[in-house]
Amino acid sequence: PDLVIGFSNLQADIAASLIRAGVEVHIFNQRSISQVLNMIAVTGALVGATEKAAQLIATLEKILDEARQSASKFTIKPKVYFEEWDDPMMCSIRWAMELIELAGGTDCFPELSNFHSAKDRIVTSQQVVERQPDIIIGSWCGKKFQPEQVMSRERWADLSAVKHGFVREIKSADILQPGPSLITHGLKQIQAIIQEWQRFQAELV
């Protein structure tokens, strides 16, 4: 190949082997929405598609702006626990936290989302209980989310998210791949969940 593109330190070994073999390699390490947009711009430059990349970025930025404007109408923000893995339990990576905020929610563990390594985002069942999420979103990377398993955890039956049926799945392909899909698919699903929660709250008044 003329160029190999990879992502994160997880591909460091194979990248090193390719470099030693004389292959040109570019490894991205995007963890935020702004870094994802920059990755698209750089990829466009690397493959001679700068204009197409700029058009895609403009489309994605429009989606982000529309989500931001829609969320500005909400007077209350639900607390959202995003679970990336179940054993051990891992909370949201930075871009997932940012998407939750954009859609009008508050991430339960924003202080952990900035950590690059998943092991630094491990949480306990008790910590989640203490944060009292209104919404639980599961996106177990590479395997099917099991809401019944989540709801059966000790003391989770008393959580608002469980009592009111706001334990939901977003497919990992839609939100955990660090590219356009987390905006075109992931964000829109988070918006739909939060908008449903807002309607539910309005009915309680």
What are these regions (language model features)?
Residues N9, G48-E51:
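Residues in soluble alpha-helical coiled-coils and helical-bundle/repeat scaffolds
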Residues T50-S70:
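Mid-sequence helix-capping/hinge segment at a functional interface
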